[in-house]
Amino acid sequence: MTPRRAVLDCGSQRAAVMPTLLTVFCLLLLAPGGGNRGLVWHVEDAGGRVIRSRHGDRSLNPASLVKLATSLWALERLGPEYRFGTRFLGAGDDLIVRGGGDPDFQPENAFLVAAALNRAGIHRITGRLLVDDLFWIGWEQGKGVPGQDPEGHAGQMAARLRRAFDPDLWDGSTREAWMMLAQRQGLDGSNPPRVVIAGGTGRAWPDSEKRVRAEARPIPATRVLVVHRSRPLPGTLKRFNAWSNNDINRLEATLGSASDLQTFLAERWQIEVNDSLRLVSSSGLGKNRLTPRLAVRLLRDLRDTLRRWDLDLSDVLPVAGCDEGTLKSFPALGRGGRRGSMVGKTGSLTTTDGGITLLAGTVATESGSRLFCVAAPQSGSGLAAARAKEERWLLDLMAALGGARGARCGTPMPQAGDGVELEEPAPPAPPGS
């Protein structure tokens, strides 16, 4: 019989009441060296008092923690009730899509629009499907920078929308997406909506752009067929943050550039742009700079901003043990009595600046709430091991503060197509009516 090896779990509920000597041992693990070699961190209580800090002012690449700044920026500029509007217009034989910058329009959203078009009696477009520069469907992993290659962008997005509109063009994943949406929203899964595009696809010129069409014919008058309005902004931000989706950079088309985001934070905090704060992207890709202390300040600012609207961090960030996404790389944080105690954001880069993995958020303990940022710089060759070390650090912190205070999971993270609104203008009355 193989003897069992004793394991000291400083993050367990039992650790919260262990004898004094063992408690001291767990606290030593939080000190420089110990089991945390290579980590840097900064921790504050709910009121902003520094609890502990190790290289908290070290300039680091924050990776996807930049998405916290982008979320704050979007909320301040647009407000929590904001919905992105996408208009579907009839223009002669063509269907024109005027995007409103919705960064999270998916095939599921296209299914709902197709159903609305069907209700209006539209099942076939004899002309073309044209989309403008502010329309996206599906994901690009942050590669689609707004404003770059508008012709290529329009061609790709129009082709995706055409496929989503026509079940005969669906692949297996698109069909599965329809069945899941139908199940969630009580639709007839055996009768999917269908809008066939008989003509080609391409770019719809922006309304403000002066351009002569290649065809020597007048541009026909347009009429609104359907207006699709996204779910309110917080739900969209939560989806991007939970999956650490770099397509959050699509918000630049609505808000401004990464340089504008940097200026927003610098002016808001009244600090200079230097190696403590330097942003080159709104997604976290590239060589951005932030300190652990400023990452915690960013979390606090986001938390306080959300509270103005009776919201909290869990409305825009995932909850360990409750939500899908990248927090599952830290599985112990959502188990047992810890479930619901931690709300946060992950960040990782494999090669840039030697690689880094970070975890920042708020954790509820028996001693109160704590805001934290922990990072493992130069960990590109061993991200999994670095995440395990960060997880152990946070478990030990919880234990030192009396243990985690778990909570029931709240409203589930919205799925694609959930929470949207459709405006379907009444068809024009026949002449003489």
Q: Which stretches of residues belong to each language-model region?
A:
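Short, well-structured active-site flanking segments
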Residues: 76-92, 309-314
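A small/polar active-site loop signature that marks catalytic segments
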Residues: 146-150, 160-316
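Sec/Tat-exported extracytoplasmic proteins
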Residues: 73-82, 99-101, 108, 117-124, ...
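Small-residue-rich helix-loop
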Residues: 51-53, 255-433
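Acidic helix-start/capping segments at beta-turn-to-alpha-helix junctions
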Residues: 85-103, 128-140, 213-218, 223, ...
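A short, well-structured edge-of-sheet supersecondary motif
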Residues: 29-54
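Active-site SXXK
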Residues: 62-80, 129, 240, 372
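Polar, glycine-rich mid-to-C-terminal structural blocks
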Residues: 103-177
